[in-house]
Amino acid sequence: MIDGLRKKFIDFFVKNGHTYLPSASLVPKDDPSLMFVNAGMVPFKEYFVDVRRAPFSSIVTAQKCVRAGGKHNDLENVGFTKRHHTFFEMLGNFSFGCYFKERAIELAWKFVTEELTLSKKKLYITVYHEDDEAFEIWDKLTGFGERKIKRISTSDNFWQMGDIGPCGPCSEIFYDHGEHLSGDIPEDKKDPGERYVEIWNLVFMQYIREQSGELARMECPCIDTGMGLERVAAILEGTDDNYKTKLFEAIVKESQNVTGNKDNQAAHKVIADHLRSASFLIADGVLPGNTGREYVLRRIIRRAVRYSHALGFDTVLLPKLFWVLKEWMGSHYQELTRAENLILDTLTLEEQSFRNTLKSGMKLLEEVSSSMKEGDTLSGDIAFTLYDTHGFPLDITVDILKERKISVDEEGFAERMKMQRLLAQASRMKDMAQTSSYEVKAVFLEHGKTPFIGYENFTGLALILAITEKEGSNKLTIILDQTIFYPESGGQESDQGIIEGENTLLKVEKVYKSTEGVILHECTIIRGQVTSRGEKVNLKIDINRRNSLARNHSATHILHHVLRKRLGAHVSQRGSLVAPSRLRFDFSHSQSITEEELSKIEDCINLMIWDDHPVMTEIKKTDEAIRDGAIGLFGEKYDDTVRVVSIGEAVELCGGTHVKKSSAIGLVKILSASSVAHGVRRIEAVTHLTALQYIREAEQAQLYQLTEHQAKLKAMQKSHQKEITRVYQSIVTNAEARTERYGSVEIITKNVQGISKEILLSLASEIRPKTGVLIVHTELSEALYSLIILDKEIFKNISFIDSMKETIDKSHGKVTPSVPYVIQATFSKKEDLDRCLKNLSELVVSTF
């Protein structure tokens, strides 16, 4: 039903001259005022202001929307009503000067009565009470008259984008679910209840609200309409409850099956809804975190976990239900398939990390609230302790106690939170200049923000506006009328250098910026002293430090760009450090990065560096810069104009210092990639000569390790050889021997197998007899080998040795040169060997 309804809507308007555009991301592309896309018109806001910028004059969309944070927040109602959702789809048709009120009403009426075949008896219309034109068009088209066309005077039927800008009256189509439900016909000060449900809102954008509050006619009036897909699907499926449509029933049924609990329908509704919003947010690059939209996603997942816990289910649930969502919505929203692994990994990690906190936190909450009764209020101090000490979120505390009709002192909680932040800020600033906040504010009121003139200037002149000396030390803090010293900002460490006056030399060690924009210089007195405010001083930055910071900052931009290119658009900065010696970059990514992928990332970075891209900076309007693709940090407060830094395709909003060309970075070497939190990874790297030095040291370390390894191998080989020698020596020594004595000379003969002649020769000194002659035989592959070893006395008888060699020769043996007291002989036949042994025995008898 969902897919069919969506397709029917799109096809109808395409057939009626509209261009279909796919849903935009849930993350507003160029609208820092919004946390999420929460209506179908959000992606087209700029076109209503200037229709000439619209790519098409009439458009139809099925837009993903989330309402779970900020002004539009349905989170707490989800699960307890029939129609509230954190995620929903808005079907819409839009006109940018193409058609207006009459055509918009005609198309809407034709679609609901002819395409959807809704009964006209069930339909009611509302118009803005002053919009006679809309009333007449509706009356002419439907014949309803005042009985079923109601004039509404409240702001509900007059829409405006903001305090100033495009606005106009609205008209709504309501559907009557029947008398069995409570509710009044939609009129002023009457509640339509559950009986009458708004299914389509038509906004006739025909005015511009001016600064004075006056309304001026738009030159090109526009149309913005929105139909809630889930509400209409419920009507077509014959129910007044969105959660009883087939899509939600499929998820709820699977939730019941997996948890084994079919009770507590509210819990299953929460889980089904939150699975949708969490999955689509992750698919659009949002990952759980502690600020902004990332924290809203975390709240959504944690709320689902809380309700799965209430069902008695204590393991990961949402990933086990995702396949149902993908099956029902994945054919139209293919990002669910593309980002499936990221969605499953993120849901799993977030659930696992919160379950322990939830279990212990609920136990503590039960302890502190056990004596409380309906109507009581939990103190902000206790709620804060649960959050600060035990990590138990305030919204979960509120949610749980709400079921028992116990409230929470959220103002008291906010006060404690504010106090903690102030203490933390004071702690961070304790080492900063002791300049009083009064003095900083006084400088700000008189002189404004400190002008920074250091992008191109490495030396300069300035006047001292304020001085604070740290009592009992040579430390002081100075405020200047302008500065070349870049203050610590955006993760980049500050410049250092010197400030020199007529009788003063100061070393600038740290530079900070106050919340007002006043720049403070922490200094150490090298010589002399600062005598008075108003003194003119010379400024000079440490150029080597500045260049190192610039190289590392530009390298960080390139790293960010390459990560988004290789890992996906979900990668966004979560923190950074730009120091002179290294850089550190934290980013959203749920999976570990393989060594192979890390090498490819490093290669891509260096290729961009060596492409010698010019580093270009320009000042732009913030909305224009973001629209043009510049990456900004969510939660960062930007002025109306921003500095845009471009390095090839890497474009970011940035106030930091950078190199002139990418090639000045020289080289990037990634040192490590690690995980610092769930869904957040960290890369640390070095550049330029530091990178080269690291590579050289690594090579030297490898060489040292190789040399050390070779030495160990040689030692092992020597040890093993000794062991082998001992084994062979034992074999020869213990081999069966035949001993014969001829006069004073003993001849020992041994026969061994499986030992080569080389090994036997190497054993000669170890097995040499103290007296007499040792003859060791072994069989080789093609011959018989004999090793004849003489004792020291016989060895001295040169003529005897010569006679032995001659005897071997006459017996058809071959003598091989060897060590002096050893004779090696090889025989091709055994009978030759036997004959030789007999002749040698006779030689011994005749000689000794």
Curated annotation (Swiss-Prot):
It is found in: Cytoplasm. It comes from the Bacteria. Its EC number is 6.1.1.7. Signal peptide: none annotated. SMART domains: tRNA_SAD (SM00863). Binds 1 zinc ion per subunit. InterPro entries: aa-tRNA-synth_II/BPL/LPL, Ala-tRNA-lgiase_IIc, Ala-tRNA-ligase_IIc_anticod-bd, Ala-tRNA-synth_IIc_core, Ala-tRNA-synth_IIc_N, Ala-tRNA_ligase, Ala_tRNA_ligase_euk/bac, Thr/Ala-tRNA-synth_IIc_edit. One of its GO terms (cellular component) is cytosol. The keyword Ligase applies. Its main location: cytoplasm. Its cofactor is Zn(2+). It catalyses: tRNA(Ala) + L-alanine + ATP = L-alanyl-tRNA(Ala) + AMP + diphosphate. PROSITE patterns: AA_TRNA_LIGASE_II_ALA. Zn(2+) binds at H553, H557, C654, H658. GO terms for biological process: alanyl-tRNA aminoacylation; negative regulation of DNA-templated transcription. Consists of three domains; the N-terminal catalytic domain, the editing domain and the C-terminal C-Ala domain. The editing domain removes incorrectly charged amino acids, while the C-Ala domain, along with tRNA(Ala), serves as a bridge to cooperatively bring together the editing and aminoacylation centers thus stimulating deacylation of misacylated tRNAs. Catalyzes the attachment of alanine to tRNA(Ala) in a two-step reaction: alanine is first activated by ATP to form Ala-AMP and then transferred to the acceptor end of tRNA(Ala). Also edits incorrectly charged Ser-tRNA(Ala) and Gly-tRNA(Ala) via its editing domain. Belongs to the class-II aminoacyl-tRNA synthetase family. This is Alanine--tRNA ligase. It comes from Neorickettsia sennetsu (strain ATCC VR-367 / Miyayama).
